[in-house]
């Protein structure tokens, strides 16, 4: 699967590192970095974007809202799905989850979407403590895998809360970005979805 990642000043580096590490070579990544200074209002965003996108999926990590919107237009015209976490873009084929780990399953996202997005876990216990955790689907930054390894040995009744706390230490999102719809910062949202994933996994294991 060909994935094109757009970033500004290293804004996607942690995600790309996680995808390469935990994607099991399922994805072919191409980076487009736009590191030049941009004006507050961008009228000619096309000048900074490729004329044609050769990809099955686009990941938008651009910081400039006008540039991200122009990229969304380009993807919509080309019929290429785009994931733009934390933004409010309304274009056909554009998905805007609150965080990268808030992405729901969508067949349009192909192999990437089956491996990365809202966390899905399986767990093993000895009746009292967590003895094993497998990540079936997790955050592209890799935080799900990191945090899951840290709760081995925790009491079952503390595991969900602990995972939520651990992921907040790993999360690379900006904690100052408050989402009025969800009533949480991206970091707190990440903690919430991981806690719920562990609760679901524990319910299934019993």
Language-model features: locations:
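Glycine-rich adenosine-cofactor-binding loop
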Residues: 1-20
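Rossmann-fold NAD(P)-binding glycine/threonine-rich loop
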Residues: 69-76, 81-106
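Structured beta-strand/loop patches that form or line metal/cofactor-binding pockets in enzymes
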Residues: 95-127
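Glycine-rich, highly charged phosphate/nucleotide-binding loops
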Residues: 34-53
């Amino acid at each position: 699967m060909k994935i094109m990642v757009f970033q500004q000043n290293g804004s996607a580096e942690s995600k790309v590192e996680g995808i390469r590490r935990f994607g099991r070579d399922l994805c072919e990544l191409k980076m487009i970095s736009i590191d030049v200074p941009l004006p507050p209002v961008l009228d000619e965003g096309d000048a900074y974007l490729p004329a044609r996108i050769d990809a099955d999926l686009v990941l938008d990590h651009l910081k400039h809202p006008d540039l991200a919107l122009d990229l969304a237009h380009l993807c919509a015209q080309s019929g290429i799905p785009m994931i733009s976490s934390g933004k409010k873009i309304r274009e056909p084929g554009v998905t805007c989850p609150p965080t990268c780990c808030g992405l729901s399953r969508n067949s349009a996202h192909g192999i990437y979407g089956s491996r990365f997005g809202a966390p899905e876990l399986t767990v093993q216990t000895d009746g009292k403590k967590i003895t094993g955790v497998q990540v079936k689907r997790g955050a592209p930054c890799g935080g799900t895998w990191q945090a899951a390894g840290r709760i081995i040995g925790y009491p079952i009744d503390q595991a969900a809360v602990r995972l939520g706390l651990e992921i907040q230490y790993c999360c690379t999102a900006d904690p100052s970005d408050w989402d009025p719809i969800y009533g949480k910062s991206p970091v707190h949202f990440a903690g919430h979805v991981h806690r719920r994933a562990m609760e679901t996994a524990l319910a299934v294991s019993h």
